[in-house]
Regions:
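Short helix-initiation/N-cap motifs at beta->coil->alpha
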Residues: 79-89, 108, 183-190, 261-275
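Paired acidic/hydrophobic, glycine-rich loop segments that form the ligand-binding mouth/hinge
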Residues: 102-105, 279-284
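C-terminal capping/gating helix-and-loop segments adjacent to ligand/active sites or protein-protein/ligand interfaces
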Residues: 374-431
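Hinge/lid segment of periplasmic solute-binding proteins
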Residues: 107-160, 302-304
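Conserved N-terminal structural module of periplasmic/extracytoplasmic solute-binding proteins
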Residues: 2-111, 130, 175, 326-330, ...
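Short, solvent-exposed loop/beta-turn-alpha elements that line the ligand-binding surface or hinge
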Residues: 124-134, 178-185, 206, 226-245, ...
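Glycine-centered hinge/linker elements that transmit conformational signals in sensory
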Residues: 192-196, 232-263
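Extracytoplasmic/periplasmic substrate-recognition and gating elements
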Residues: 294-356
Length: 436
């Protein structure tokens, strides 16, 4: 039996800055607003947490449940709406050596910097019992060169292709998600070829095949072990054939007029969803909530989800425990519980945050999850399959986010008509300047 899921509260912090100041919320009872590190108080263990966006632990009621099951524990969670604001404060506290919470959230874009420069400030989970259930590539993202595991995975962002069934029908293309997936199985070039067919045969006004070519570029790059950096931390984007192949294919799509030129999460993209301006968008699991919200009730059942040509990941976070926490052992126990397969499956059903635990992916309460908005697509199975396809090791870099954004801007130049070689040169100059 399938289980429908609603995505109304899914976290977008890893892709878009949510508005909001720091808000102090307690798992139970009322906080005094001054908590930093926890400790022992009134016979109870107080554990403090610093998080961002909607990581799901407070919103799903898991913190309250843990307190009920462990009456000697009190959890005080401070949540920032904006991850950038949160991380800036975390860096300040790390440099000062005070003001840290016992548990700190770590966004994937910060993982490399944490493992390279802050390993001494975070506890090692490598020997913690019951933490061997994560997807290998997820665990590798937060592991130091000498094998320390500085956090445990919360969610992940495996990618698929979201598409408009009604538009595919008007282009004479299959609409069944399995048949659609077969159109481009194994090769992103096939995805672009389908776009050429769509543009040629679509009947029903002006509709672009894809929202922007940068989504295609990101999906191609994120599906490989090495992207912008090598294992030594050296920049290789200009030498990595994967990056250049992705650039050229994205440029081919732009030159063919397949793009609506609407960059994801930039002005114009939301109206594009509402107005049905494009037929496909490369979508990580967490993006479904945004699409359903912005495309609106009028488009429910018109969208569907198909397997992407290759597995890739965009997004995800971790929970780490600070090394000098006065309740380090208790905090590690809480993190292990919050990120266990059962709790990851629960948050997925409640909020849509996709599990990073390979054991969770095998659970029926994940595999059987469907999305009513996306034509009852079996999203648990689709995104689970994508997560398993991702290479076991992914090499992250300290400036991955900056480089990704710069490539997005460079491809926008191509969409606007600039020659790809000139746009590449401009992009490379901007990257070199940004990363030093």
């Amino acid at each position: 039996m399938s289980s429908p899921v609603s995505f109304g509260r899914k976290r977008l912090a890893s892709a878009l800055a949510a508005v909001g100041a720091l808000a102090l919320v307690a798992g139970c009872g009322s906080g005094d607003g001054s908590a930093t590190g926890g400790g022992k108080k009134d016979g109870k263990t107080v554990i403090t947490m610093g998080m961002f966006g909607v990581m799901g632990f407070k919103e799903s009621g898991l913190l309250e449940r843990y307190e009920k099951e462990h009456p000697d524990v009190r959890i005080k969670a401070e949540i920032a709406g904006d991850e950038q604001t949160y991380y800036t404060a975390l860096q300040t506290h790390l440099a000062a050596g005070n003001g840290l919470k016992d548990i700190q959230g770590i966004e994937i874009g910060r993982a490399k910097e944490i493992t390279e420069t802050q390993a001494a400030n975070f506890a090692d989970f490598s020997g913690t019992p019951g933490t061997d259930h994560f997807l290998p590539w997820k665990q590798s993202q937060i592991t130091t060169k000498d094998g320390k595991v500085l956090g445990l995975g919360t969610d992940a962002g495996p990618m698929a292709v979201c598409y408009r069934k009604d538009y595919f029908a008007k282009a004479g293309l299959p609409t069944d998600r399995e048949q659609v997936g077969k159109l481009w199985a194994g090769d992103w070039k096939k995805y672009v070829e389908v776009g050429r067919t769509f543009k040629k045969d679509f009947k029903g006004g002006h509709v672009s095949y894809m929202d922007s070519v940068s989504g295609l570029f990101n999906a191609m790059v994120y599906g490989y072990p090495q992207q912008y950096y090598d294992e030594n931390g050296d920049l290789i984007y200009d030498k990595n054939p994967v990056v250049k192949q992705a650039w050229n294919l994205a440029a081919d799509a732009a030159d063919a007029g397949l793009s609506a030129k609407l960059r994801q999460f930039q002005p114009g993209w939301d109206p594009g969803l509402a107005n049905g301006t494009f037929a496909t968008a490369v979508c990580p699991a967490w993006m479904l909530s945004h699409i359903s919200e912005k495309a609106g009730a009028a488009n429910k059942g018109k969208w569907d989800v198909a397997q992407a040509p290759k597995g890739a990941n965009w997004g995800g976070s971790f929970l780490g425990v600070t090394e000098k926490s006065p309740v380090k052992a208790e905090a590690q126990k809480l993190v292990a519980w919050l990120t266990a397969p059962e709790q990851q499956a629960y948050i997925f059903k409640k909020l849509g945050n996709f599990p990073s635990s390979r054991t969770a992916l095998e659970r029926d309460d994940v595999k059987n999850v469907t999305s009513a908005y996306f034509s009852d697509a079996p999203i648990g199975q689709i995104f689970g399959a994508a997560a398993r396809e991702i290479p076991d090791k992914q090499v992250l870099g300290r400036k991955d986010g900056t480089i990704k954004d710069t490539f997005t801007q460079g491809l926008a130049l191509v969409e606007q008509g600039q020659a790809r070689d000139k746009a590449w040169k401009t992009t490379a100059e901007r990257i070199d300047k940004a990363v030093g």
